[in-house]
Amino acid sequence: QVAHIGQRISFGDRIKVAGRPIRVRIAPPPARILAYHKPTGEVVTHDDPQGRPTVFQRLPRLQNGKWMSVGRLDLNTEGLLLFTNSGELANQLMHPRFGVEREYAVRVLGTLDEGARNKLLTGVEIEGQSASFVSISKGEGEGVNQWYRVVITEGRNREVRKLFDAVGLTVNRLIRVRYGAIVL
C-alpha cells in the first residue's frame, strides 16, 4: 500500500521506496509477561492430541506474536506458570546459568528425616545427573501427609517429584508458589 504523511510503521513492516526495499531499524515491541495459576488437569501445550484442556486455551489473545510458556508444569502439578511473548526473556528465566529460583509447596506421604534432608540438599543422582534443592523448610502437616517448601534453580522434567522419590517419599500434591521474584 502507498504510505501517507504521518503514517506509522511497526516492527516487522517491510518498506520499499521506488520499488526497492530499504532497511529501517525499529525496536521490537516490549516483552509481555503473564502470570497464570495453572490448575491440575490442564496440560502445557498448544495442541493436545488427547483432547485435554490446555493452558493456552485460557490465555488472552495477542495481536502480534504468540504466548510461550516459561518452563512447564506437569498435568498433576498446579501453581504459578509464567508466559511471555519474548523468546529472549523466556530463555533468561528458564536457563540454569541464570539461577532463577522456583519455589514449591510439596505435600509428601511420610516424614523427611535429617539424613534424607541432607541428601536432598547435597545432591542425589537422577538419571545420571546430580540434582538437589537449594533449600528445604518444614511446613504444616497432620497424620501421614507432611508439607515442605523447597527451592530449585533448574526446571528439569518432574525434578521435585524425582528428588523426593530418590529418598523414598511420594509427592501427592505439588504447587509452584514462586518463580524468581514473582509470587503466586
Task: Name what the model sees in each region.
Residues 1-184:
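Basic, flexible Lys/Arg- and Gly-enriched helix-loop patches that mediate nucleic-acid binding at interfaces
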